[in-house]
Amino acid sequence: NPLAVFMDIRDEECTLCDGRNLEVHPDVVGDFRNMPFEDATFRLVVFYPPHLVRLGANSYTAHKYGKSFSSRETGLKQGCEECMRVLKPEGVLIFKWNETQIAASRIIKIFGVNPLFGHKSGKNSKTQWMCFLKSAY
């Protein structure tokens, strides 16, 4: 959608282990911990950071979803703060997380605010979608 801005730290193409080509070409190359946008730019931000640390450097999952960093709790807190910074005063943050290696309850503690609501989905209900209001942060 031309109204959306896709930001990712990666800009790459690779061939996955099953032979498929993966292309990641964001509109903006940037780190979610230090976004290249002015304060109060967006009404809605979707934050879907890499959630896995224990991955091989060339694994399918690392290429497709990205690999988290060793200081992920600090990075996730910084990412949440950046999302709130770029949101307009009544903005909404949609956060997607998979609980395979860290529970969503831990993420909520890291963020320091409860979501307005959430929804579990995916295999074994490990994927969580959460909605946060900037005004509650």
Regions found by a protein language model. Give the residues of each.
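Class I S-adenosyl-L-methionine-dependent methyltransferase catalytic core
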Residues: 1-137
